[in-house]
């Protein structure tokens, strides 16, 4: 099953917007967090009036950083400056790690709960949303005979794919340990990166298939014997289930010279074993 009518979903949501806005007018204003300042420092805020201790941890600081509460129970602190990049972070409230409720940009992951903050540079990053033609992301579900369950895929198609007829090369891009099929787009921004590379003639138009790399719950370390077994299961599912689904529903070139596979962490190991 393929979810194509993204625009329809968005338009349907718009019908509900006036009602939701009306209801929100009676609510207290949200706490703005994070705020990226001009000097590339970041101000984090969290409303937690009943908490006794709140910290924040980021990848541009070392260790947990304490926040200070005001009279209304809003904890805040400013960290950095940080080098331009996209960083995960989370709050630790009385010892419990939580994502930032004021930030819709979430790091998709099975274990840790983190939000994302982008520190812009003087020049747009390769993953920035630029004024170029953009491709589409399609969320799909397929029946896995190998695992005997329904499994997700995220598939990128390049600009002009919907109106075209040409078959295209395909890259199978596998998620890392504890990551999901959404991590490559929501964190890696691979769709915007390829949009920009295609526009700059630095990459050919291609389709990217992003499967959920976890073949079993409780993923073992990549060095264990169980991990090698999991790599074999991934190879079987790729050949038996994923490739036939993709080749039946998308205009991909099915010969080995036009197929590639890559991955991060666990996904890198799965790619090498395929």
Q: Could you say what each language-model-derived stretch is?
A:
Residues 6-18:
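Bacterial N-terminal signal peptides
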Residues 21-25:
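Boundary at the C-terminal end of the N-terminal hydrophobic targeting segment
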Residues 1-3:
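N-terminal secretory signal peptides that target proteins for export/translocation
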């Amino acid at each position: 099953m393929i979810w194509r009518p993204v625009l329809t979903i968005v338009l349907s949501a718009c019908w509900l917007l006036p009602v939701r806005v009306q209801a929100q007018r009676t609510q207290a204003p949200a706490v703005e967090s994070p705020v990226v300042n001009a000097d590339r420092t970041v101000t984090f805020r969290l409303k937690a009036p009943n908490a006794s201790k709140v910290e924040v941890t980021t990848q541009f600081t070392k260790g947990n950083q304490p926040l200070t509460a005001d009279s209304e129970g809003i904890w805040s602190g400013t960290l950095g400056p940080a080098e331009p990049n996209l960083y995960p972070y989370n709050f630790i409230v009385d010892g419990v790690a939580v994502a930032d409720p004021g930030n819709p940009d979430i790091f998709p992951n099975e274990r840790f709960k983190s939000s994302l903050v982008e520190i812009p540079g003087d020049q747009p990053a390769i993953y920035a949303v630029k004024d170029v033609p953009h491709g589409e992301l399609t969320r799909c579900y397929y029946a896995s005979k190998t695992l005997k369950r329904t499994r997700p895929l995220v598939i990128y198609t390049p600009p002009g794919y919907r109106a075209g007829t040409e078959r295209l090369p395909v890259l199978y891009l596998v998620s890392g340990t504890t990551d999901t099929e959404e991590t490559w787009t929501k964190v890696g921004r691979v769709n915007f990166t390829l949009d920009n590379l295609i526009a700059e003639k630095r990459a050919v138009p291609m389709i990217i298939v992003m499967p959920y790399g976890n073949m079993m719950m409780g993923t073992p370390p990549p060095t264990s014997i169980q991990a090698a077994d999991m790599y074999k299961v991934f190879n079987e599912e790729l050949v038996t289930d994923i490739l036939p689904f993709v080749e039946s529903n998308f205009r991909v070139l099915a010969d080995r010279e036009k197929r590639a596979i890559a991955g991060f962490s666990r996904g890198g190991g799965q790619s090498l074993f395929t």
